[in-house]
Structures are given as C-alpha cells and as structure tokens.
C-alpha cells in the first residue's frame, strides 16, 4: 500500500 499502516493495498 501507499502508506505503512495500509500495507495490504
């Protein structure tokens, strides 16, 4: 993901 806390995207 685009941001560390949304890695799954």
Swiss-Prot record:
GO BP terms in the entry: defense response
Subcellular localization(s) per the UniProt record: Secreted
Swiss-Prot/TrEMBL keywords: Amphibian defense peptide, Secreted
UniProt keyword annotation of Secreted present: yes
The name this protein goes by in its record: Tryptophyllin-2
Family according to the record: Belongs to the frog skin active peptide (FSAP) family. Tryptophillin subfamily.
Tissue: Expressed by the skin glands.
Role according to the record: Putative defense peptide.
Main location group: secreted
Gene Ontology terms: cellular component: extracellular region
């Amino acid at each position: 993901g685009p941001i560390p806390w949304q890695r799954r995207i």
